[in-house]
Amino acid sequence: MELKEKRVFVAGLGVSGVALCRVLVNLGANVIAYDRKNEIALKEALEELKDLPVEIKLGEFKEEFLKGIELVVLSPGISLESEIVKKAKDMGLEILGEVELAYRLSKAPIYAITGTNGKTTTTSLLGEMFRNAGRKVYVAGNIGYPLIYAALEAGPNDHIVAEISSFQLETVKEFRPKISCIINITPDHLDRHKTFENYANIKGRIFENQREEEYVVLNYDDPVTWGLKERAKAKVFPFSRKKVLENGAYVKEGFLYLQNKKVIKVEDIYIPGEHNLENALAASSVAYLSGIEVDAIETTLRTFKGVEHRIEFVAEIEGIKFYNDSKGTNPDASIKAIQALKTPIVLIAGGYDKGSEFDEFVKTFDKKVRKLILIGQTAQKIKKTALKYSYPEEDIFLVDSLEEAVRKAYEVAEKGDSVLLSPACASWDMFKNFEERGKAFKKAVMDLRR
């Protein structure tokens, strides 16, 4: 793809936007970057770009910003309903997202992972399987390291394992991973995608360009994910926790199998919980189909310790264990976290409202969630739902900050309980992202020891 001397407009100056600017300048493009935020909010991004020949536009979008532009590249945070996209379409400009641009520039095969929950764990686990098999791998995408960087750095004999979000899939055109994988699909981001059907269809775009010689890995147990199989031109490789699938990945008599090959005893997989068994099956399937030996897969499953902010053990204080599941950004993710812990729980939940319903979330409390500490935009919404299902009002506490939530949780918890931060919501009402929220939780827990 020729970008030299091309006038390129980059919309959005988050992590992906800054990376796009760097790469496009490196490839000889004339870059104009735009974000509606002000200089104070974009301090870090502007600091990173200050030595690059990038023209910066901030504040309210003006049509004149697109004058002379030949290509518009969108950061994942920019909606296709935005004024920028509408104007660019009216002007007949080519519009790409980061994933599409990275694919067109990459010399290395891409193994793409999506799903509502488990993406980061599965992507990290798969990357580790490649490493343990002695392959040079770049783990990138929605996981933190921009895919556009990996695309430029990886050679034809290397491998890119990419976590891909629904926001990123909105803008794919020719994107064709060597192997794609959908772990699961449950309602999320309905504030952006409007309907669950639309959200599920966007997830399915991960494999829409794959050919007959390639593979798509799908969760047999999830009816929405499995229902997408009819759209696949690639070979479908299923995985299941519940059913023996001779031509897929499955569990039989307490062992994980890949087709007819016994891999590992399920109880020997280091990361706990049924949801992590699902992640293990998904990652193992992609690794197996890419030619990685079963020994390397088994070693990784036995030793991989999980990732930060996913049911991460933080500390034990006075017989009370604290777990950070800040990545629980939707109800289904938090349901899985509650199910994974075996002790009584004091739950800290609430945050930015993405339009989620909390009925199924509250139904899993049963007698396991002893106390409920609520924060953020959705605090009243979750409380109302909990009361609807007869959760005791005296066991619900609304507080103003995460630090206060941690102190209150410690106060009401008993020896043998687990305090679990699993918000079932995004972090954007109080924090920049779920990582910042998770770090704030861990600091607040450590402050209890002072």
UniProtKB/Swiss-Prot annotation:
Instruction: Read off the InterPro entries from this record.
Output: Mur-like_cat_sf (IPR036565), Mur_ligase_C (IPR004101), Mur_ligase_C_dom_sf (IPR036615), Mur_ligase_cen (IPR013221), MurD (IPR005762)
User: Which HAMAP family has this protein been placed in?
Assistant: MurD
Q: What class of enzyme is it?
A: ligase
- Main subcellular localization, coarse class? cytoplasm
Q: Which Pfam families has this protein been placed in?
A: Mur_ligase_C, Mur_ligase_M, MurD-like_N
Output the lineage of the source organism. Bacteria, Bacillati, Bacillota, Clostridia, Thermoanaerobacterales
What this chain does, per the record?
Cell wall formation. Catalyzes the addition of glutamate to the nucleotide precursor UDP-N-acetylmuramoyl-L-alanine (UMA).
Q: Which domain of life is it from?
A: Bacteria
Query: Which keywords does this chain's UniProt record carry?
Result: ATP-binding, Cell cycle, Cell division, Cell shape, Cell wall biogenesis/degradation, Cytoplasm, Ligase, Nucleotide-binding, Peptidoglycan synthesis
Instruction: Give the family this protein belongs to, as stated in its UniProt record.
Output: Belongs to the MurCDEF family.
Protein EC? 6.3.2.9
Q: PANTHER family per the record?
A: UDP-N-ACETYLMURAMOYLALANINE--D-GLUTAMATE LIGASE
Annotated positions binding ATP: 115-121
The record's subcellular location field reads: Cytoplasm
What protein does this entry describe?
UDP-N-acetylmuramoylalanine--D-glutamate ligase
Q: In which pathway does it act?
A: Cell wall biogenesis; peptidoglycan biosynthesis
Question: Could you tell me which Gene3D superfamilies the record lists for this protein?
Answer: Mur ligase, C-terminal domain (3.90.190.20), Mur-like, catalytic domain (3.40.1190.10), NAD(P)-binding Rossmann-like Domain (3.40.50.720)
GO biological process annotation, one example: cell division
List the GO terms this entry assigns under cellular component, sorted alphabetically: cytoplasm
Q: Which organism is it from?
A: Caldanaerobacter subterraneus subsp. tengcongensis (strain DSM 15242 / JCM 11007 / NBRC 100824 / MB4)
